[in-house]
Amino acid sequence: MIQKETNLKPIDKCGVWSVRAFHLYGGSFRNQSTISNFLKVSVKKTRANNWVPKKTKLKAIIVTLKKELKKIDGSYIKFRTNNVVLLKKRLTPKGKILMGPVSSNLRRKRFLTSFCGSI
């Protein structure tokens, strides 16, 4: 589960190496977010001379978690890192290519169609 002040790693190729969550969408007293939830992040580490500078506030969607999640068939799924995809508008990713695994829960919630073949 993702809480406020959690360090996350973006998996889209936009030159950002590390971000930190500071707002979770879905209610004023929300404490935790899971896969396919939106959050507001701040950029902490970037590549030099990048078009996304440090301290930029962006919207993101969670794609993988370290915490294990129970699937519909009863099995569990777990990833090594907490990853997000940085967004430009509602559902368009900032980078062109997504690197690494993505949870199948996004396919069930129909987010994959908005990423237009990059997953």
UniProtKB/Swiss-Prot annotation:
It comes from the Eukaryota. Keywords: Mitochondrion, Ribonucleoprotein, Ribosomal protein. One of its GO terms (biological process) is translation. Pfam families: Ribosomal_L14. GO terms for cellular component: cytosolic large ribosomal subunit; mitochondrion. GO terms for molecular function: large ribosomal subunit rRNA binding; structural constituent of ribosome. Coiled coil: none annotated. It is found in: Mitochondrion. Belongs to the universal ribosomal protein uL14 family. This is Large ribosomal subunit protein uL14m. It comes from Tetrahymena pyriformis. The lineage of its organism: Eukaryota, Sar, Alveolata, Ciliophora, Intramacronucleata.
